[in-house]
């Protein structure tokens, strides 16, 4: 199945199971001061998960476009994107694990066509200190589902990611973790404030035997390792508990279920590819890059991933009315466009890529998110303006870094400030470039940079 078919099939399945298909939220949350973007499917539904009644009932589903700016520096590997779509379904006090887990398993195996022998899961190991039991119910349901398909369902207790890195999952189908399988808005049970809800979760992973485990992420692979063999494709949260004033936990009167599954990752699993950039919603953008650059994805993998992802994300932000700027959503958009331009230079695309790629993005999403295609000319104009403003100064800034390296100089805070102040290069981009090219940084670069920045701000205030 391609990604478009998976999106449609998910909503059809949930609707047939009595879920109301709710309208998606915008990516840009203008009335939420706590966050810049919608970063998960549950985010717009949080008031209802915390107890409010939803006007459409207790069984809900949607597909939510999301943007996570915090993943920007991770883009370039085979699994991270800033923009993605989240398949979501929720029960507000209606059903629990006994309905959620089997339906998810059937969707992945019978609808999407994933091999059950390559599906692995995780469950909550329990927290005796807080009186929270081990999630045997979820594990037992998973064990039954696997056994019915003739798949082994061994268990292993790993508790922490660090322990898993040292010992591996040893082929066990069901791995028990601690904080990795606990959901709350604030982290583990210790970090939660009194009155806040939380609960165990059960993650689903797809195993790629053709990928060699990266030992940089531990000696042995396991479900929650970033070593490359296991790709998380979904997570069911069972919001069951409320933290009490005395630091303990009590059961909520209404148990909720919150499922989120990454469309791009499920689609990658469906074509047996550990690379999410090869799915039907992203690969045409890569192909357009290959055509305009005359270079191949296999030779310029990281650069093409960054450009494809960042232009896609920037196009959706522009469709939501964001323009590049120096604060909040505008700053994130500026970073996306400028990073795309920087990595585009690796492909010898010196004039930017917006005009070539935005129409492709618009066509890919025209059936479900028509606003990109409808505003194509305006979006291209917004992105091209930023590209043109930054292209010349970017080349000069990169030239300065190369010259310093040729002369054997260490990159200092003063150099980084010059790149920021004179050439308009964001500090993050300069640091990233130095790391990519292994240019040495002065030990006191941060202190020096901050001193110069504060002095500039003082001069600016005095001039007003």
Task: Describe each model-derived feature in a short phrase.
Residues 250-253, 297-302, 320-321, 384, ...:
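Active-site-adjacent structural elements in folded domains
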Residues 344-351, 387-464:
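Extended, domain-scale alpha-helical bundle/helix-rich regions
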Residues 340:
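Aromatic/basic-lined ligand-recognition segments
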Residues 349-378:
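Cytochrome P450 heme-thiolate monooxygenase catalytic core
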Residues 1-310, 315-335, 343-353, 358, ...:
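Structured aminoacyl-transfer and RNA-binding surfaces used for tRNA recognition/handling
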Residues 285-288, 310, 357-360, 364, ...:
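Short acidic/histidine-centered micro-motifs embedded in hydrophobic/aromatic stretches
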Residues 293, 297, 369-387:
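Long, non-coiled-coil amphipathic alpha-helical linker/lever segments
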